[in-house]
Amino acid sequence: MKYDLLVIGAGTAGLSAAIYGVRAGLKTICIEDAVYGGQIVNTPEIVNYPGIPTITGIEFANQLYQQATSLGAQVFYEQIDGLDFGLFPKRVHTTRCEYQADAVIIANGARHRKLGCAGEDAFEGKGVSYCAACDGNFFKSQVVCVVGGGNTALEDALYLSRICREVHLIHRRDTFRASAAVVEQVRQTQNILLHLSCTVSEILGESTVNAIRIADAVGDAGEETIPASGVFIAVGLQPNNTIFDRWVDLDSGGYIVAGEDCKTKTEGLFAAGDTRTKQVRQLVTAAADGAIAATGASQYLYSKNSKK
């Protein structure tokens, strides 16, 4: 099947790209291996998207999907098992068939890295969150935990300290990986309590989280149970871009190297959203990337066709 534009992923960046693609007159398809919407469907309420005071993650995803498909974009749910971006048109092979497209946007996102402890999956969306900026306000004046030792974890702890009564910051090492200025700010914040050289052994609760159990990572101090209403996990993101590494450059974290124009090193191949190198990974930046990448793809195809 032949398309003008093929988008890999149907999250916020992917569906935004599809909207801009079809509005530019491109025959557009999204290939998604899970559910449309991406990570945002796990967020109970979105309160930081400009122009929309409040909306659930599922509602937001539904509206994006309906807007894209009503304009004419197609969304297929298939696993990609091969590709060739060196040809024109480019080829994407799935478990069902081969797709051809003149331009491709990679918008497969990046998944939050999980701890892998007991209770994590059971309480996701019920007290376990991977986004303090998205969900922190649900825990106003309550006790929460943040797990991680990098800039994101410490910045999350600082953000939550202004909302929550008490923040327990848990890190498996005895020193933080965050910048010195952020570490000092955390240490000076009275309602942030540090638990260094500790690992999370279990997240506890009934219908929602009510405690977290941590263990001494280096000695034999045993375990401690901390009563808490929320657990914010910030141990990094995990892109899955090795299938593309022949056609794009990857940074040390596995993200696709692409600038603000979303262009990769391969002609006609773009990267949008959380999958690419960037400083801020939020809903609004993913939507912006999708628009930029699709506009770039449209300009690329116009330029290519005008030379024929």
Where are these regions (language model features)?
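Phosphate-coordination loops involved in phosphoryl transfer and adenosine-cofactor binding
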Residues: 2-4, 77-78, 140-142, 197, ...
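Beta1-alpha1 glycine-rich phosphate/pyrophosphate-binding loop at the start
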Residues: 3-71, 154-180, 251
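Glycine-rich, N-terminal phosphate-binding loop of Rossmann-like dinucleotide-binding domains
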Residues: 10, 108-109, 235-236
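Residue-level detector of alpha-helix initiation sites
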Residues: 11-12, 35, 110-112, 150-152, ...
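A Rossmann-like FAD-binding core segment of flavoenzymes
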Residues: 68-87, 91-93, 98-101, 161-259, ...
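Glycine/small-residue-rich loop that forms an oxyanion/phosphate-binding "nest" at active or ligand-binding sites
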Residues: 75-138, 149
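FAD-site-proximal beta/loop scaffold in flavoenzymes
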Residues: 116, 122-138, 234-282, 289-292, ...
